[in-house]
Each structure stands twice: as C-alpha cells, then as structure tokens.
Amino acid sequence: MQVTETLSAGLKRGFTVTVPAGELESKRTARLKELGQSMNLPGFRPGKVPLSIVKQRYGDAVQGEVLEQAVSDATRALMDERGLRPAMQPRVDLVAGAEPGGKADLEFKVEVELLPDIAQPDLSTLSLTRLKATPDAETIDKALKDIASRQRDFETIEDVRPAAQGDVVVVDFVGKVDGVAFEGGTAQDVNVELGGAGFIPGFAEQIEGMSPGEEKVITVTFPADYSAENLAGKEATFDITAKALKRPVDVEIDDEMAKKIGFEGLEQVRELITRQVEQEYEQLSRLRIKRELLDALAEKTDFEAPQGMVEAEFAQIWQRVEADRKAGELDEEDKEKDEDTLRADYRKIAERRVKLGLLLAEIGRANAITVSQDEMLQAIRAEAMRYPGQEQQVFEFFRKNPQAAESLRGPIFENKVVDYVIELATVEDKDVTPEELAEIPPADL
C-alpha cells in the first residue's frame, strides 16, 4: 500500500492511497476458490468446479466485495499507522482500479477530519456553588391544597341563574368541523369548570353566562399541536346544551381526607410531600451545579471543533427549531431575530456542545471512566418501564439495535464524568429560596 498526503489544514487531512493490483488479484482468487469449495454444478464433483466457471458466475460480486474490503482495510491501516483519530467517518472517493476485470492498481482518495488534541484542565482549580433549598410550610400547604382540590365534591345549584366563574356547568355537546360531526366530539353530562383547565382554549370561556336549559353554538380553534392530528389547527363548532350548575364543596385538610386517599393520617401525607419536594429540589440543585460546571469547562475549550461534528449537531438543533416554529412555539426572543442571526446563534450553541462533549469525553477517557453493563441494563429497564405491558418488546428493540442502546450510554457517561469533576472541584453550599433554585438559566447547552 502506498500513501501520499495531499492535505493538511487544521484538523483536515487528505490522502491518496494506492493498493497494488497484484494484492487485489490474490484476494479475488482466494475468495473465488473459497466459493468454489461449496459450489455444486451438474457434471462436476462437489468443490471441483473450475475456477474459470466460478469466476464467470461470481466474478462481479467478488470484485465489489474485494474492493470494498480493500478500501476499508487500507483506510483503517492508514489511520492506525499514522495515529490519526477521526472525528467522523472518513470520506472515500475511488479514482481508479474499480473497473471489471481488475487489472489496474486500486487508487482512492481519503478525506478525514481529526479529533483535536485536548489538554487536560486542572479540575481542582474549579470553584462551584451548590444551591440548596428547604421545603417551607407554604410549599407543603400548597401541595396539600392541590390534593384537597382534587378530592372535592360538587353540589347542585338549585337556583336557575347564569353560570359564573368557579361554577361547574354540566353540558352535552356535539363538535363539528365543516359542519360534520367528528369522532370523539360528542359527549353527555360533561363537567366544565369555569376558570379551570383541561379544555380547548375558548371552550369554557364561551360557556360562562349560560343558564340550565339554554342552548348555544360556540366556535373554537384546536391548537396546532393538538394530539389528534386530524383536528390540529382546525376551526370547529360545538352545539352546547347547559343542563345544570354545580358548585365545588371544599374538602377539609385533615386525617379524614388523608384516609380517603390511602394514608393513615395527615402527618403521613405531609412527610411524603416533604420527601417528594426534597427530591425535586435535589434534582434542580444538580441541574444548576451541572450548568455552572459546563459553563466553567466551556471557558477551557480553547481547541478547534471538527466542523463536520458542528454541522451535524447544528442540523439536529435546527430541525427542532423548525418544528417549534411550525408549531408556533418559538420563544419570543427568537421570533424577533432574522433567519441569518438565528442560524448564527444556534451554530454557536452547536459548537459549544461539540466542544464540551469532546472535553468531557477526553476527561472520561483519561480517567478510565466507563459505563458498565449493569448501568446499561438499569437504563434499559428504566426505559422499558415507560411502556407498561411492552417491556419485553423494548428489551428486544435495544438488543437488536445497538445504536439505540448507545443513545442511552451517552447521558450515563456524561453524568459520571460530571460527578467525577464535581468531586475534584471546590464546592461551596449556598442556601437559597425555592424560587431562586428554580430560576432557569438561558438554554444554550
């Protein structure tokens, strides 16, 4: 094999590789002989078919197979011999030697973008702040009120009067699109709480003021991201019949309420809520310190990012941006930007992500951080639990799709590296309010 370097610019390298025709011919002949050993033809003993006949039948297929293997082997040898670490799959273009008959040397070009050399930062110099919040009585009381509101009963309002905020209107309705009733759009004795949530925007608002016995036609527009795709974004009418009014009856927050929902008493409910809130605060605290850590590491990414990786990351980000724009969910700040500015901003985010990913990977590699089989199994089990009754199918999916399993490995590895770095850093605990803990930093990770 002969190799000539044709490009060396930044992280990009280019080579011309030549594999002698004789070497290819030897591999072709060996492969044809191998096929001949198992070939059966009338008039010939098993394994005794002449090579010329084997070549006539399988020559083109073997030619392609040998060329593909030769290119793969030569490219891998090139990378190994020169100690090159590709950032992505090398690009290969055949120049000569791919013609049927295979009499010429095989010549092809290889273009590859390399991973940068990354210096190990001194992680012990990092200073981080761990935000800590404690559940207060107000938070626990609010959670108890939310539980009580879900347990409340309703009593019928005997007076015939227009429905007002806070009332529950019992209605029958028939929904139509373009004058035709649609599936799932007809129901009887539905409770609509005025001022509550759970209905299409504008639905409950137009029922306010109706009295029992009154009929009305209202018009609403389904949200663009509505779960039923055949209705998403469409205008619909609903024939409404108000049948009765009810008012909610508050439930006392006491031991009796606790027993109704399966607890021994109110104190047990308080303890459970407190543990749940503490876990929520711990998760928020970890997200905040992880963000602070990544911001600190981003300042140490003074190396070039492989542009192929940046482009691939940007493509994924931009796909989500386009989906948000189509659904009308682009945030207000992005809505005000022109296309070029928006692309430039998200390209910077893509480059930051690639650099941080490479730095974390290098820290993990240098410190022998790996993801164990047990950790992978736990991740797959957690994923399977999201699909009750289909756990076995989920396990089979990951067994047959190693790339899908790798998508679970990445976050586990990243979190292990983050934990490792936090252990080495100087961490100061800081007490904050729940509101301060919940503040969301700009989403540029």
Swiss-Prot record:
GO MF entries: peptidyl-prolyl cis-trans isomerase activity; protein folding chaperone; ribosome binding
A Pfam entry, by short name: Trigger_C
GO cellular component: cytoplasm
Keywords, alphabetical: Cell cycle, Cell division, Chaperone, Cytoplasm, Isomerase, Rotamase
Subcellular location: Cytoplasm
Listed InterPro entries: PPIase_dom_sf, PPIase_FKBP_dom, Trig_fac, Trigger_fac_C, Trigger_fac_C_sf, Trigger_fac_ribosome-bd_bac, Trigger_fac_ribosome-bd_sf, Trigger_fact/SurA_dom_sf
Documented EC number(s): 5.2.1.8
Keyword Lyase carried by entry: no
Reactions mediated catalytically: [protein]-peptidylproline (omega=180) = [protein]-peptidylproline (omega=0)
The organism's place on the tree of life at top rank: Bacteria
A biological process term (GO) from this entry: cell division
Keyword Chaperone annotated: yes
Annotated domain remarks: Consists of 3 domains; the N-terminus binds the ribosome, the middle domain has PPIase activity, while the C-terminus has intrinsic chaperone activity on its own.
Biological role stated in the UniProt entry: Involved in protein export. Acts as a chaperone by maintaining the newly synthesized protein in an open conformation. Functions as a peptidyl-prolyl cis-trans isomerase.
Family, as annotated: Belongs to the FKBP-type PPIase family. Tig subfamily.
Name used for this protein in its record: Trigger factor
Naturally occurring in which organism (per UniProt): Gluconacetobacter diazotrophicus (strain ATCC 49037 / DSM 5601 / CCUG 37298 / CIP 103539 / LMG 7603 / PAl5)
Top-level taxonomy: Bacteria, Pseudomonadati, Pseudomonadota, Alphaproteobacteria, Acetobacterales
